[in-house]
Amino acid sequence: MDGILSGKTIVVMGVANQRSIAWGCTEALIAQGAQVILTYQNDRLKQSLQRFVAPDVPLIACDVADDDNVERAFASIKQQYGAIDGIIHAIAYADKATLEGDFVNTTKAGYDLAQNISAYSLIAVARAARPMLKPGASLVTLTYFGSERAVPNYNMMGVAKAALEANVRYLARDLGPQQVRVNAISAGAVKTLAVTGIHEHQQLLKLSRSMTVDGEPVKTREIGNVAAFLLSDLSTGMTGDVVYVDKGVHLS
């Protein structure tokens, strides 16, 4: 039986390992019939992906810290695979020093780095991909509750995620006329490589779990299932939205 993404080609950006939310999304997309293309930042991450990604899944180099690199990556995708139906943007980074202590001590360099990689990169990706997005295409990015609440030890990343959510709304407006949608998933805390880089991350995970409605943490595959929906033709009426997939943590 065909899935809701059968016949669609989706680019997934940000898979680091098998615990990544981006990988949970990738598995959900494949289960729903999508052809996926994964991007990687550098050779080390490429080698990591090759350990668990099926050999028939294309891997394309893309370092979002450099606009020209992003343009080359999507030009390569277009040349090899043609137009695409969607993108998952699951990329974020902040210097560890900007996540701890008092936010007032954030440096300009730390601020700029987090905003560039975590928020601006979505704009760069949308711009590079725009000529190859089919009508009905969908872009999905990942955010977190720390964008609207002052979460301990999240600091600069919370500010970057707030900017990312604003980017979603403006990109949704700009890309709407060509029938391209842009949405964000606000995912619950999951023990990923990114989360383990947060000071006292175990406390964050414990607190998040205590706030879910059923006492169980959200799973990466559950997040991926919602991403699949947002990338499918079942969600054509949704754009510019932040969709919570956190088992009710945001209710508290």
Annotate the PLM regions:
Residues 2-37:
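Canonical Rossmann dinucleotide-binding motif of NAD(H)/NADP(H)-dependent dehydrogenases/reductases
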Residues 14-25, 92-131, 135-177, 189-191, ...:
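Catalytic loop of short-chain dehydrogenase/reductase
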Residues 50-52, 177, 189-212, 222, ...:
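A glycine/serine/threonine-rich, flexible loop-to-helix segment
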Residues 53-68:
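Rossmann-fold cofactor-recognition segment
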Residues 176, 181, 238-240:
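Short, small/polar-rich loop/turn modules that mediate ligand/substrate recognition or access, typified
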Residues 181-191, 231, 244-246:
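Conserved SDR Rossmann-fold cofactor-binding beta-strand/turn motif
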Residues 212-223, 234:
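A conserved structural motif in NAD(P)-dependent oxidoreductases
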Residues 228, 239-252:
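Short C-terminal tail/terminal secondary-structure segment
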